[in-house]
Amino acid sequence: MDNLAHALVGAALMRAVADRHVPRAALLGIVAANAPDLSELFIGLPGTRADFLVLHRGITHSLVGAVVEIIGLTLLIGLGWRVARWILSRNARTVAVPAWNWLALGIAAAVLSHLYMDWQGSYGWRPFLPWNGTWYYLDWVAIVDPFFWLVPLVALAWGAERHWTPLAAALVVGGTITFFVTRAHDVVATWVLVVYAIVCVVAAIGWTRYWFGPVGRQRAAAFALLVLVVYTGAQAVVAGTRKRTIQQAAERRFGAGASWAALTNVGRPFTWESIYASTDTVAGDDWRLARHLRARQVQRAITQTRDGQAMAQFARFLAAEVDTSGATVYLWDARYARGSRDGWAVVKVRLE
């Protein structure tokens, strides 16, 4: 999912897990929840398009990578806190230092939330790198979902002091979210806009009536996470039914060996786009493309060139086109590009 969702869910999660034991738990949760993406800066990103396809959601998002990030962040933050305590103690000042176990538990929860939230969508997750590069997809929740912004933000605001500083922060983030949601009204389902508005009204009432405050902020965060769990679980149940329907349609269309997927739709929770494929064709309900994967030039591109190999390992539904000269091959993932020669999910390979 997007980094704002990771940040807000991570903040709420670490507050729910360790707020009584770790100072600034929400702030640390923001950092920890984005550690898998931030770590990519140390392994070659940003880079070329091929670098992105290979490295994004790569080793830093694997289970091994998560263990390294959890240990590294715990040591970095824990030791930093203790150094700060030692420095301040020389001036007769004190600072609360969290216990190692609670710090590690909160950071682990936030880091692992990133992996799970990426897994629940249609982009995919590779948990077993560096040994196995297989992608896994739950196809439950879209890569961008406004409720994964709004629900944790409301909980964090409810748990804050009634002061203009935290209120201003919540209003800036909430206002930005609202701007993008309303701007995309043609993409976002009407019921989502209605529920979004209702939640905003409830958020304002809860803040002014002090339903939660600093004393109850851990409960507020836990409540928000419970709401997201129920929301995600409901989508998982509906997705299961939709997947069975799509699988049956794929087998009727292309036989028992057909591949298929139920792709999440941004802005339209509880709906999925059908995609079906055989070895020669990839199609949806109202479109169809030849894959051309057996063409000699395509085989050469995906086995002997770096860009081609990058797209081949990434694409869930790989398709290709060879230009009329036979010297250039266009490769794309039909989830995100369908016959186009431009876009982030398209790779152009020139054969020498």
Where are these regions (language model features)?
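Extracytosolic and intramembrane catalytic regions of membrane-associated proteins
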Residues: 251-352
